[in-house]
Amino acid sequence: MGHQESPLARAPAGGAAYVKRLCKGLSWREHVESHGSLGAQASPASAAAAEGSATRRARAATSRAARSRRQPGPGADHPQAGAPGGKRAARKWRCAGQVTIQGPAPPRPRAGRRDEAGGARAAPLLLPPPPAAMETGKDGARRGTQSPERKRRSPVPRAPSTKLRPAAAARAMDPVAAEAPGEAFLARRRPEGGGGSARPRYSLLAEIGRGSYGVVYEAVAGRSGARVAVKKIRCDAPENVELALAEFWALTSLKRRHQNVVQFEECVLQRNGLAQRMSHGNKSSQLYLRLVETSLKGERILGYAEEPCYLWFVMEFCEGGDLNQYVLSRRPDPATNKSFMLQLTSAIAFLHKNHIVHRDLKPDNILITERSGTPILKVADFGLSKVCAGLAPRGKEGNQDNKNVNVNKYWLSSACGSDFYMAPEVWEGHYTAKADIFALGIIIWAMIERITFIDSETKKELLGTYIKQGTEIVPVGEALLENPKMELHIPQKRRTSMSEGIKQLLKDMLAANPQDRPDAFELETRMDQVTCAA
């Protein structure tokens, strides 16, 4: 029997033991469940079963009924047959130990992205939620960055990519950046005539990305002059802190580097003009402990809204954009496709070997660098990732280096990810690391055949496969959940050249039953074989 995404031992809130045990990656929902009934704590398997398919089906159907669906654009050719029509059984989501919601939850970073599927959070005590925040469903519905009515996407002609904005314009358009008291020391260019002032640690050059919870800049390190990417996150809401800490914990848990995983340099916590370098598990830092407590309790701990607090993540800079931009701006190249397939499978095998489940694999989160002369992929954005720690003997704490942990038997229950890349079992809320294999299959299939759709909110063209059901387009995982016996037509386009080995491997990666999918290590071996034979 595999591990469960289970709560850890109880400890007094606010104490060192509380933070030491709960900073392993548990969300606030999981902490609440750990203080629920003793029966649920004694039997993690029964608790997971209680959140199984029978109790979850109402919610997804209700969510689908509220969505506005769009028709494919003129001339769109998608031969993939959909599942038979008809009304679907209602699915109701239930969360143990649900917290009463007192206000709307803050928005998430990107459209289409779903995060921890827990009960609704209590509103921050000292900071009212922003007025534009999305309301959490009364039944403890999934939180996400979209409106409750998730818009469908339609395959339409490509849209031009957005150009980068200069740093000065970015700061002028970003009120959050303008009001940061310590930013001049941390990340702004040295002012003219300031010969006696301290050299800034990083100088911002241009804004290269923006989301609901942060801004990403291209920057230059003050001492070395190296180009880096700096992600600035305002910690005024527990939702932002939870995402930031999840990414921080995942990247700092890696003991070795991998060329296909984005390199994390450092994290700086800034408050009231002071900057402090953060390290994972630093119990001597009161700011760090309060940050963890903010995430776990779901309420602001760091102070009043007038005292802005920021996290700055410094990572390697990838000048080639993301996988969407790179692939869709170039002519199809089988050699590049093979190289990318090998790099992606190598990266996922490395993460799973280090007990990290990404849970949000998609082309947006795969970056490109060409500094070596050839394109190198970098898996990035670990905000929804999960570090699967082992269950240690009684009286000892879990050890994230436990080599006995098998991520393919570590059961997760938080439905999160981006809908067009989510595996069927993720929609159900009971899955393992095999969900990453499914998402990778969607990405590789779409990359080979250039299958795209347009995000109805951002109007951005995205690589991704889908199923046509009449005039609607449906995520492959959702369609397989409704009809597990549905046959996927790979390749979809008759003109696509694809070897039999790659066809079969993609079908195995996209199997409705996760037990029929290869794990990351088998996938890496098979990918080497089929790409050499192709």
Curated annotation (Swiss-Prot):
GO molecular function: ATP binding; protein kinase activity; protein serine kinase activity; protein serine/threonine kinase activity
Low complexity composition-biased segments: 39-65, 166-176
Pfam families: Pkinase (PF00069)
Sorted UniProt keywords: ATP-binding, Cytoplasm, Kinase, Nucleotide-binding, Nucleus, Phosphoprotein, Serine/threonine-protein kinase, Transferase
Limits of the Protein kinase domain: 202-530
EC assignment: 2.7.11.1
Active site as annotated: D360 (proton acceptor)
Record note on modification: Autophosphorylated.
Subcellular location: Nucleus; Nucleus, Nucleolus; Cytoplasm
Tissue expression from the record: Expressed in testis.
List of residues binding ATP: I208, G209, R210, G211, S212, Y213, G214, V215, V216, K231
Coiled-coil annotated residue ranges, if any: none
CDD domains: STKc_PDIK1L
GO CC term, one of those recorded: nucleolus
The reaction(s) this protein catalyses: L-seryl-[protein] + ATP = O-phospho-L-seryl-[protein] + ADP + H(+); L-threonyl-[protein] + ATP = O-phospho-L-threonyl-[protein] + ADP + H(+)
Signal peptide range in chain numbering: none
Chain spans, region Disordered: 32-176
GO biological process, one term: negative regulation of G2/MI transition of meiotic cell cycle
Miscellaneous comment as given in the Swiss-Prot or TrEMBL entry: Association with PDLIM1 is controversial.
Record text on subunit structure and interactions: Interacts with PDLIM1/CLP-36.
Family: Belongs to the protein kinase superfamily. Ser/Thr protein kinase family.
Protein name: Serine/threonine-protein kinase 35
